[in-house]
From Swiss-Prot:
This is Guanine nucleotide-binding protein alpha-14 subunit. SUPFAM superfamilies: P-loop containing nucleoside triphosphate hydrolases (SSF52540), Transducin (alpha subunit), insertion domain (SSF47895). Mg(2+) binds at residues 86, 222. Residues 321-328 are annotated as: G4 motif. The lineage of its organism: Eukaryota, Metazoa, Ecdysozoa, Nematoda, Chromadorea. Keywords: GTP-binding, Magnesium, Metal-binding, Nucleotide-binding, Transducer. PANTHER family: GTP-BINDING PROTEIN ALPHA SUBUNIT (PTHR10218), GUANINE NUCLEOTIDE-BINDING PROTEIN ALPHA-14 SUBUNIT (PTHR10218:SF208). Residues 237-246 are annotated as: G3 motif.
């Protein structure tokens, strides 16, 4: 079956724990019950039946998919916690497919952005307690905001953000919140905080519908495996985002043994953040507090994941693309947080040039010398930057494939 760059492919897989609470995406502790189903109305009945079968049946189903889409170059997106995997995926939809343009999509993302802004507010409030900056001087503002937010449910149907424009703007511009924001690495805070709060006047307009940049900045925990097909320079690519599949990778990674490319995304600011990967994106709401004392640095977690993925026999023949993401935020944080606490052997200057080089070398060394690894630095929220970096990546992939097949 042939696809062109004008075809929109939205066949979505999801691996779900059959033992966890309320449809939790965390695999069960005894390692049993990982089932496969597809979010598609047409296939719902078929895949309900599939969910009752075992792993052998699942693999047979995937084998059929491989035959159907065997002509595509399969690109698997993996990475560390909150690294921007889904942002890259959205950019591919914008650049190479048809983006997000339907009324239904725009209204859904508008609701998500409203929720993101509420989460940002709550995270900043929680952050004040973490960093020890009291909010007494702006208590009247937070009281007004709380009064408006209090009746809201998760899926509020009536937009009230226009009522919040004035108090939220005053809240964001306050001395206390700006000081808390400077110390954002010490607590959980959405990367889109500054972007959304500085665009609040536009977003709060009653006629507002998000543009593509607004959508790229939006944040929603990825609980499923999403895929798109698009053409690039005459070659058909199948890109798969495995963002929500956190634990026990060895149990599902072999299902993608025909992937030609692994696009591994790393959050450069992760050197300054501590987290626990297994709980990072699996809770209903963002985690407002970080337990700094007991968790590893995000970047150390990402390095461990990359080492595991690079050593996986299922991906032995894949080309690895390293996307060192959030360059813009990384440069900001470098002036406040040194690299050495995360990497004790780093003895260079805390400049962008020296720190980025050191981090890049750490990841390259984590892969076998026989691996084809191509590092790239990017800002995933910048569409033009992603477009240029992806072009450079695919040139590397095509050259590596030509070399492997003796065509170069």
């Amino acid at each position: 079956m042939a696809f062109s760059c004008f075809d929109k492919f939205s066949y979505t897989y999801c691996y779900q724990c059959m033992h966890g609470p309320d449809g939790c995406m965390v695999p069960s502790r005894n390692g049993e019950g990982t089932e496969l189903y597809a979010h598609s109305e047409e296939l719902e009945a078929k895949l309900r039946e599939l969910a009752r079968r075992g792993h052998m049946e699942i693999e047979k189903e995937l084998a059929l998919e491989k035959k159907t889409y065997g002509s595509h170059i399969k690109i698997l997106i993996l990475g560390g916690p909150l690294s921007g995997k889904s942002t890259i995926f959205k950019q591919m939809q914008i650049i190479h497919v048809d983006g997000f343009k339907t009324d239904q999509e725009l209204i859904q993302y508008r609701g998500l952005i409203d929720n993101n802004i509420r989460d940002i507010y709550l995270q900043l409030i929680a952050g004040s307690r973490v960093v020890g900056i009291p909010l007494d001087p702006i208590e009247h503002i937070t009281y007004e905001i709380d009064e408006i937010y209090a009746p809201m449910s998760d899926a509020f149907s009536v937009r009230t953000i226009s009522e919040l424009l004035e108090p939220l703007t005053e809240f964001w511009n306050s001395k206390q919140i700006q000081e808390i924001y400077k110390r954002r690495c010490e607590f959980e805070l959405l990367d889109s905080t500054k972007y959304y709060l500085e665009n609040l006047t536009r977003i709060a307009d009653p006629t507002y519908l998000p543009n593509q940049e607004d959508i790229v900045h939006s944040r929603k925990a990825t609980m499923s495996i999403n895929s798109i097909v698009f053409e690039y320079t005459g070659v058909s690519l199948l890109m798969i985002d495995v963002g929500g599949q956190r634990s026990e990778r060895k149990k599902w990674l072999h299902l993608f043994d025909d992937a030609k490319v692994v696009l591994f995304v790393i959050d450069l600011t992760g050197y300054a953040k501590r987290s626990e990967e297994s709980r990072m994106e699996l809770s209903r709401f963002p985690k407002f507090f970080r337990d700094v004392g007991s968790n590893a640095y995000d970047m150390k977690v990402a390095l461990k994941i990359f080492n595991e993925v690079a050593a996986a026999s299922a991906l032995a023949n894949a080309v690895f693309l390293l996307f060192f993401n959030k360059v813009d935020l990384f440069k900001e944080i470098l002036s406040q947080v040194n690299l050495q606490p995360c990497f004790s052997k780093f003895d260079g200057e805390n400049t962008y040039e020296e720190t980025s080089k050191y981090i890049c070398e750490k990841f390259i060394r984590a892969a076998s010398s026989k691996k084809s690894v191509f590092p790239h630095f990017t800002t995933a929220t910048n569409t033009e930057n992603v477009k240029l970096v992806f072009r450079a990546c695919m040139e590397s992939v095509f050259k590596a494939n030509a070399k492997a097949t003796g065509l170069s």
